[in-house]
């Protein structure tokens, strides 16, 4: 009877156990079939298996992320795509970001299944799918954040020269998707690097651990083009926005002082600018979240390729993996807090959410939207 039970279990690697007296220490990969071991970097096979409770805790955490991200990003896509007042060229980038964030959460069921089976349960095929989804959504979100920064930069620093049209916004979004494609296809086809399990063997990413020149070159290249480039663009655009706002306010105060008046702004101008600033703050917050969530992962991959690999324990590498997914869950709620017109639509369509948006700022955002659409019609 015992022989029959043991036959149904996946065979263990001979080196997968260490015995010390009556205690047994299992290593990662102890429950992986022999034909799947070849896909796991040797670094992880030398690491101790974490307690089962850690797997289960991460599985439950990802269940929460999956539902929160699906609900939040689903509502953003629904409202931004069906509300006429929100259907503007600028919001095409917000919609694109929500799509990338939604795609990011679609790989959560793979992680959840692996976690509750304590390892590389679904095998290499689903590992490739998991990593492909992660590469597309992560790199795409970064480049979309840069595009949002570019758009906000033009809206706030060049209010009389808004040249963003639907055609231009769609083309920019298509370029973003095309930009992401090589970083998925190259490791997926193993033409350059490969996708492999990482950490607790429940998630997958590009190989940053193999000790060869090609791996180091790939890690350095993808780090530059998928993290450094969008980060530099984001920092440039938002630093220009902040500088413009401070200089503009300073100029208005000085002019008002010369004219011996309290302020040169009308109530309408104040309301309109408040709405624009709130939208800019939302964009800045999301870009900050992108930077905070992806920096640990970038540092981890650089350590794996160029540094001391002993620093990369399974538990340590799971933290950056979780922060990357967390930002996809938070993004839509940042807009729910900060975007006046989106809050107004939420209040109208989902009154049970208890959103209370003042009509003044939403109306000013609406007038800005109308002005944009009028300018686009004139340009056409």
UniProtKB/Swiss-Prot annotation:
Broad class of the protein's primary localization: membrane
Keyword Phosphoprotein: yes
Keyword annotations: Chromophore, Disulfide bond, G-protein coupled receptor, Glycoprotein, Membrane, Phosphoprotein, Photoreceptor protein, Receptor, Retinal protein, Sensory transduction, Transducer, Transmembrane, Transmembrane helix, Vision
Disulfide bonds: 127-204
Location within or outside the cell: Membrane
Side of membrane Extracellular, spans: 1-54, 115-130, 194-217, 306-313
Bias (Low complexity): 361-380
InterPro entries hit by this protein: GPCR_opsins (IPR050125), GPCR_Rhodpsn (IPR000276), GPCR_Rhodpsn_7TM (IPR017452), Opsin (IPR001760), Retinal_BS (IPR027430)
Residue ranges annotated as Cytoplasmic topological domain: 80-91, 151-168, 246-281, 339-380
Cited Gene3D superfamilies: Rhodopsin 7-helix transmembrane proteins (1.20.1070.10)
Protein origin, superkingdom: Eukaryota
Regions crossing the membrane: 55-79, 92-114, 131-150, 169-193, 218-245, 282-305, 314-338
Topological type in the membrane: Multi-pass membrane protein
Gene Ontology biological process terms in this record: phototransduction; visual perception
Description of post-translational modifications: Phosphorylated on some or all of the serine and threonine residues present in the C-terminal region.
Reported function: Visual pigments are the light-absorbing molecules that mediate vision. They consist of an apoprotein, opsin, covalently linked to cis-retinal.
Additional observations: Each Drosophila eye is composed of 800 facets or ommatidia. Each ommatidium contains 8 photoreceptor cells (R1-R8), the R1 to R6 cells are outer cells, while R7 and R8 are inner cells. Opsin Rh4 is sensitive to UV light.
The family this protein is said to belong to: Belongs to the G-protein coupled receptor 1 family. Opsin subfamily.
Protein name as catalogued: Opsin Rh4
């Amino acid at each position: 009877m015992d022989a029959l039970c043991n036959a149904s279990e996946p065979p263990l690697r001979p080196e997968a156990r260490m015995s010390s007296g009556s205690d047994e220490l299992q290593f990662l990969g102890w429950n992986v079939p022999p034909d799947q071991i070849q896909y796991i970097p040797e670094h992880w096979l030398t690491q101790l298996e974490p307690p089962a409770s850690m797997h289960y805790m991460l599985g439950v955490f990802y269940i929460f992320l999956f539902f929160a991200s699906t609900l939040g990003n689903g509502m953003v896509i629904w409202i931004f795509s069906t509300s006429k007042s929100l259907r503007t060229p600028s919001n095409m980038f917000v919609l694109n970001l929500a799509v990338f964030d939604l795609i990011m959460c679609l790989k959560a069921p793979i992680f959840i299944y692996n976690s509750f089976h304590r390892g590389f349960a679904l095998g290499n095929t689903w590992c490739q799918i998991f990593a492909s989804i992660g590469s597309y959504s992560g790199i795409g979100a970064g480049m979309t954040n840069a595009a949002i920064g570019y758009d906000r930069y033009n809206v706030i620093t060049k209010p009389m020269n808004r040249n963003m049209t639907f055609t231009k916004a769609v083309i920019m979004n298509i370029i973003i998707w095309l930009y992401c494609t090589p970083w998925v296809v190259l490791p997926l086809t193993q033409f350059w690097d490969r996708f492999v399990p990482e950490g607790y063997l429940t998630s997958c990413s590009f190989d940053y651990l193999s000790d060869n020149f090609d791996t180091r070159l790939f890690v350095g290249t993808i780090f530059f083009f998928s993290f450094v480039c969008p980060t530099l663009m984001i920092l440039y655009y938002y630093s220009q926005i902040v500088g413009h706002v401070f200089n503009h306010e300073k100029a208005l105060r000085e002019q008002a002082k010369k004219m011996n008046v309290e302020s040169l702004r009308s109530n309408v101008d104040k309301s309109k600018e408040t709405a624009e600033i709130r939208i800019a703050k939302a964009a800045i917050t999301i870009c900050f979240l992108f930077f905070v969530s992806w920096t640990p992962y970038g540092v981890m991959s650089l350590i794996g390729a160029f540094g001391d690999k002993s620093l990369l324990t399974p538990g340590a590498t799971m933290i950056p993996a979780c922060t990357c997914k967390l930002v996809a869950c938070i993004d839509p709620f940042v807009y729910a807090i900060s975007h006046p017109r989106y809050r107004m639509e939420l209040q109208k369509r989902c009154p049970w959410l208890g959103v209370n948006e003042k009509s003044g700022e939403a109306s000013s955002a609406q007038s800005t939207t109308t002005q944009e659409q009028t300018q686009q019609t004139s340009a056409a």
